[in-house]
């Protein structure tokens, strides 16, 4: 068992001789269990690639609005060939969680997209993220302590948190659940 840390991801590897593959595969569920909500993806398919594949398989389109991540989500998803209808980068502005959710509903309707994903600006280590689907809107205010990291690392962390919400929705999981070391401060559903 080994690991490689490259914030925001810690890569876990279980390696050994091919003759012991069955033993390693038997151990892997325990590793997955210990990782819990911190598990982002398994194998070599990145989270943006996984999201893009699932969106294509389910014939869903997505539109994005980014403040803090400044277009990083659009870059990641377009690089993975996601069915991205539109994306916008807005200047930082103070928003309540209800406002983020409301504007996301409007954005989905305006762009005729199946899904809309918004990342607001960061205030006091907290960020609003909203996902609007055909069934409704799930918005969360998350607290994470990442101020010691460079701006681009904090942006990658927030992009990963937003994509995790999408992955959870696509997999039928609780969208507003805790994300490991990230604390859910507030939720809002429309």
Positions of predicted regions on the chain:
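An accessory alpha-helical subdomain
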Residues: 1-30
């Amino acid at each position: 068992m080994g690991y490689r840390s490259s914030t925001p991801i810690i890569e876990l590897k279980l390696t050994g001789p091919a003759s012991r593959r069955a033993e390693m595969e038997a151990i892997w569920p325990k590793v997955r269990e210990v990782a819990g909500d911190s598990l982002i993806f398994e194998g070599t398919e990145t989270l943006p690639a996984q999201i893009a594949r699932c969106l294509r398989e389910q014939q869903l389109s997505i539109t994005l609005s980014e403040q803090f991540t400044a277009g990083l989500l659009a870059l990641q998803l377009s690089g993975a060939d996601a069915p991205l209808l539109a994306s916008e980068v807005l200047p930082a502005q103070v928003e309540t969680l209800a406002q983020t959710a409301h504007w996301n509903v409007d954005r989905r309707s305006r762009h005729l997209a199946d899904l809309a994903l918004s990342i607001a600006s960061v205030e006091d280590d907290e960020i609003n993220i909203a996902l609007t689907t055909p069934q409704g809107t799930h918005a969360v205010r998350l607290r994470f302590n990442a101020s010691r990291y460079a701006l681009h690392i904090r942006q990658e962390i927030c992009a990963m948190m937003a994509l995790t919400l999408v992955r959870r929705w696509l997999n039928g999981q609780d969208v507003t659940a805790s994300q490991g070391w990230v604390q859910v401060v507030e939720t809002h559903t429309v």
